[in-house]
């Protein structure tokens, strides 16, 4: 079956010489077409080959969280599919969940280009996209059309971000409007106050600013849908502890750790080839390997602070089985990937899932849930 994967890789997962954003847009449009015409030829055949090549199932990886069934713990992180154009196809790539967005109440074009870069020396990405998206209303329409064609096969989350034009003091109503437009079309929702690419957004992580947002969403959430919070890796331990306490107060379903980092410490890349500027002068968040250790440290801290009572989705620097296992044993029940998937290719998901089953057998564990947080037990 992997004979199909070889030609698909250079088509869908671009070479290091290509324009990252242009190639990304091409891929999303291609996947959208395959999903829309999934019952026609050749799209039906292509989809069957994708599923045969990249999917892996084992009952030892199945978990139930928030009343949702996750066939495996490995998900697609927010940022890859901002407008939900591939929402119906991510399960075919073997993912156990997919998070769409970030989406804002108001449509916005994002920051000027170029704004998406790869740092191959560091196995990292640099992005300053600025939450470019078509807005919550359009995303709701897209998802309604997608779910009318076929039911979703994996849990779908939506990452909610503040619109750039909305003043910080009106952030709560902005998040609520997005949630109100989208609440019928996804399985869980994420409050994103940690992107470094929306001016002032990270200020909303402070307790005084975050509490009104969580309170407003809590009031709006009559159906008690899972609400999670995505946090920055650049917070200090005191701020993290405050956020954990707020998560308990407002009964958040979980915490996603972490978003991208503004730190440039330890990077091998000194100059960004696309601009010729010193990497330290370039705005944006770093993803991938440089984020790996810090995100795992934060996962472990949250797990300890909550005694494992608040589920954690771990994201940041996952490329291999060992990367995934480290985050699970630190306390993550679910995982998300983005940069690692770009560098390693679409078979990364299957390889990691097969490896997790082998790890469970080696450790004498009968189910993945038994591995969550065992580094601290």
Curated annotation (Swiss-Prot):
Pathway entry: Pyrimidine metabolism; UMP biosynthesis via de novo pathway; orotate from (S)-dihydroorotate (quinone route): step 1/1
Disulphide bond pairs: none
- State the signal peptide span: none
Keywords for this protein: Cell membrane, Flavoprotein, FMN, Membrane, Oxidoreductase, Pyrimidine biosynthesis
TM spans (from-to): none
Q: Which reaction(s) are listed as its catalytic activity?
A: (S)-dihydroorotate + a quinone = orotate + a quinol
Binding-site residues for substrate, renumbered to this chain: 82, 127-130, 192, 197, 259-260
Subcellular location(s): the record lists: Cell membrane
**GO terms, biological process:** 'de novo' pyrimidine nucleobase biosynthetic process; 'de novo' UMP biosynthetic process
Asked if the keyword Ribonucleoprotein belongs to this entry, the reply reads no
What is the stated purpose of this protein? Answer: Catalyzes the conversion of dihydroorotate to orotate with quinone as electron acceptor.
Instruction: Share what the entry says about its subunit structure, partners included.
Output: Monomer.
| Name of the protein | Dihydroorotate dehydrogenase (quinone)
> Per the UniProt entry, what species is this protein from, by scientific name?
Gloeothece citriformis (strain PCC 7424) (Cyanothece sp. (strain PCC 7424))
